[in-house]
């Protein structure tokens, strides 16, 4: 199903029906919060109680090799050591998350795990083929994300696995917005309501 038209209308429809899970939030240019400037967030969970997401384009000065070394996990595949670790959000940055794809009878699903066993499997090249490693997450209380979207802080964009796993980190902000036909670089930092 392809939806077209004003992305703000699409955002309102999605918010009112609470179907933001498995979507991206793309920070609008006027969002001047250090943590969220030019952020792309994968929304893992959204319901009446709030939302949880992971920033997918903010690398830390940390690699998976350093994390595995800290956890005393031996690396069987040397190339895995250079895998970037991302700042997943401002909450719980002492906690790590693995964002990965898993096949199910309903099709591919994106899941989050905090399992040390999964990190061990990844180090042994027995884990998922595609994954992100993050520290922290972004969270919203009931109604908070909806208010931010209504304030034009975020574009709501349908999920795309290439953006999540294949697009270079520096290109994800532009490429995610382009999924709904928006050239984010052409938008003004001064946006309001008509």
Swiss-Prot record:
CC terms in the record's Gene Ontology section: cytosol
Matching NCBIfam families: PRK00228.1-1
Family: Belongs to the UPF0301 (AlgH) family.
Protein name from the UniProt record: UPF0301 protein CBU_2093
């Amino acid at each position: 199903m392809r939806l077209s038209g004003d992305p703000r209308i699409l955002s309102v429809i999605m918010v009112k029906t609470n179907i933001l899970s498995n979507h991206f939030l793309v920070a609008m240019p006027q969002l001047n919060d250090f943590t969220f400037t030019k952020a792309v967030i994968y929304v893992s969970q959204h319901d009446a109680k709030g939302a949880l997401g992971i920033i997918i384009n903010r690398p830390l000065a940390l690699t998976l090799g350093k994390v595995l070394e800290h956890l005393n996990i031996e690396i069987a595949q040397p190339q895995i050591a250079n895998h970037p670790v991302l700042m997943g959000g401002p909450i719980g940055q002492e906690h790590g998350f693995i964002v990965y794809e898993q096949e199910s009878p309903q099709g591919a699903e994106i899941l989050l795990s905090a399992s040390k066993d999964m990190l061990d499997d990844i180090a042994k090249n027995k884990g998922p083929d595609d994954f992100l490693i993050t520290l922290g997450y972004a969270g919203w209380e009931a109604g908070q994300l909806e208010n931010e979207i209504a304030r034009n802080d975020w574009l709501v964009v349908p999920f795309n696995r290439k953006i999540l796993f294949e697009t270079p980190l520096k290109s994800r902000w532009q490429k995610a917005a382009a999924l709904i036909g928006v050239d984010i670089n052409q938008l003004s930092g001064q946006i309001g309501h008509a």
